[in-house]
Each structure stands twice: as structure tokens, then as C-alpha cells.
């Protein structure tokens, strides 16, 4: 299921052992190499003073409308407990507010949100707010991860806009691959006697 990052922020973390919420999600920890979420920074009275304030996504048993379910508070980790998470934290990387441009250098705007899959926590799309002039026609762009060519500390570079728009237009011009039995040869619409006086 695709979920907006903005909807995940503030999601309760539910502990089976405690029988209720122990924290809420503050922000995501994203690996810029593959746009996979490794964990979440948490906040709340039970975790604010503890060193272990990070939820590794591998500890999540279930994600539902109620929140993210884990076994117990012991599942939370400190920043230096998991080497991969520690390495990403040192990069201080965040997708939100990164500028987006094409390979040719056309500025498209900056990232205001993104979608991810709730099964594997991989970013699937970025939502880009357009510059003021372009926003009059199209205020936001939704760009698939397949269009991303490179990610730096300051910007996301995507395939040239013409290719992205062409691919989107082809997708919208999709014709279903089925035969309409009422359009077969030899079929004639029924005649009606609707004579107008």
C-alpha cells in the first residue's frame, strides 16, 4: 500500500507488551543510495529521555490505521546500535526540501512530500512543488523513483522533463487490451422508432 510520508509523521508506535502507544514518529531515516527507509526517529514521554529513540523498520510487526505495532520498547535502538543506520545518520540526509532538476538543468521545484510502500518502506514517488510561474499551470509534480538519475546533498536529478512528460502521456493514452463484443464485425445497433413530430 502506498502511504504519504506526511501521513506517517505522528503515527503512534504501539507496543504489544505495553498494550498501547509508547511513542510517535517524528521523522524518517532514509538511505540516499536506494531511497529505503531504515528507521524512524521517535518522540514521546517514554522515549524522549532515553538514548534508544530510533525504530528500526525490521522491528515493525504490522502497519495499520491504528499505528505501527512492535513487540516492546526494547525493540528501539540508539543511533550507534545499528551500523547502517549510524552511517546514514552521519550523512544528515533528508528528502524534504531538496531541489529537483532535470539532467539538462531545468529547475522543477523542491520536494514537499513523498510516497512509500508500507510493506518494505521504499520511497516510490516524490511530490515536487513547482516554482511560482510554473505553479500557475501545474502546482505539483509527482515523479516516480524510476525517473531519478542521481541524488546529491542538495538536489535530486531526474531524466529530462520531455521524457518524463512523454512517458506520462503514453500511460494516460493506454487502451485496454480487450475486445468489446458489441463492436464485432456484423453487429448493427438496434433500430428505434423514435420519430420526432
Question: What is each of the regions a protein language model found here?
Answer:
Residues 1-197:
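Peripheral interaction segments used for macromolecular assembly
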Amino acid at each position: 500500500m502506498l502511504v504519504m510520508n506526511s501521513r506517517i509523521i505522528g503515527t503512534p508506535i504501539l507496543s504489544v507488551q505495553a498494550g498501547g502507544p509508547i511513542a510517535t514518529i517524528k521523522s524518517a531515516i532514509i538511505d540516499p543510495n536506494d531511497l529505503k527507509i531504515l528507521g524512524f526517529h521517535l518522540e514521546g514521554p517514554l522515549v524522549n529521555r532515553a538514548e534508544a529513540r530510533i525504530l528500526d523498520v525490521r522491528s515493525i510487526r504490522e502497519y495499520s490505521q491504528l499505528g505501527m505495532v512492535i513487540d516492546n520498547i526494547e525493540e528501539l535502538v540508539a543511533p550507534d546500535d545499528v551500523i547502517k543506520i549510524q552511517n546514514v545518520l552521519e550523512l544528515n540526509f533528508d528528502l524534504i526540501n531538496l531541489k529537483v532538476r532535470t539532467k539538462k538543468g531545468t529547475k522543477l521545484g523542491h520536494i514537499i512530500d513523498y510516497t512509500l510502500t508500507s510493506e518494505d518502506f521504499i520511497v516510490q514517488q516524490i511530490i515536487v512543488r513547482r516554482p511560482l510561474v510554473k505553479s500557475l499551470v501545474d502546482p505539483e509534480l509527482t515523479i516516480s523513483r524510476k525517473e531519478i538519475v542521481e541524488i546529491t546533498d542538495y538536489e535530486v536529478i531526474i531524466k529530462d522533463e520531455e521524457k518524463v512528460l512523454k512517458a506520462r502521456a503514453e500511460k494516460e493514452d493506454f487502451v485496454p487490451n480487450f475486445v468489446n463484443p458489441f463492436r464485432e464485425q456484423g453487429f448493427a445497433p438496434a433500430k428505434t422508432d423514435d420519430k420526432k413530430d
